[in-house]
Amino acid sequence: MLGNAMKSLFRSGARELKDKFSNDEDEDEFATPYNLRIGGAVDIDTLPMRMHVDQLRMRLPEETLIIAAQGYIELGDGGFVHRYYAANDSMIQVLTINGVKDQHVEEITLFTPFKSYYPSDRDEWAEWTAKDGRIGRTTFTLDDGTEYDRIWFDDTTSYAEPVAYSEFVYEDPESDDHDEIHHKAMLYGRNLEADKKNEYLLVSAESYDNEKTVEVMIGVDLELAMMKII
């Protein structure tokens, strides 16, 4: 299940991180599973999800996803999260363990944006990130009443501190230029029915370039067979 390896997130230097992903053939380019890459395209077979679309809260992609940026998060113990962002802010997230080749992939998840919040002052920011704030409670409820249970630290029956980590986002694989985004995040989820896929809710307070937002994304598991990578 998504999230099992993401409790030990920690930061890594941008140049050091890029070096870890460099191909032997071309040290300026990132190694990446399944040939997912900036400028590449992904068609996702959404039929398995559309069978249950009336229960899903996520917006399913209607068109080919063109990868415009790549993000990297180091988990420690040989684990990395690779994020592939489309222009519409949909995201394919891939977890790899002990390597970055196809055989090292543990999980693939599709996330689509649900809602953005823009805290205007310290008090509003604290509503999300302070102790007992919205990010970290045992449940998260959408405006329509849909409730998600906390997945990270699900063995804790009270508030849990959001997971803090840094993500390095690149728009040019041949350049060291990048954005560093600081996250305070928590993963939630719900079972649609016993025989249906889980739906995830990723809530992240993000700060970068003197900006602060709270991003809520909804996701589902993907199988490699559901993706056509071009």
Regions found by a protein language model. Give the residues of each.
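Mixed-charge, low-complexity intrinsically disordered regions
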Residues: 1-63, 70-230
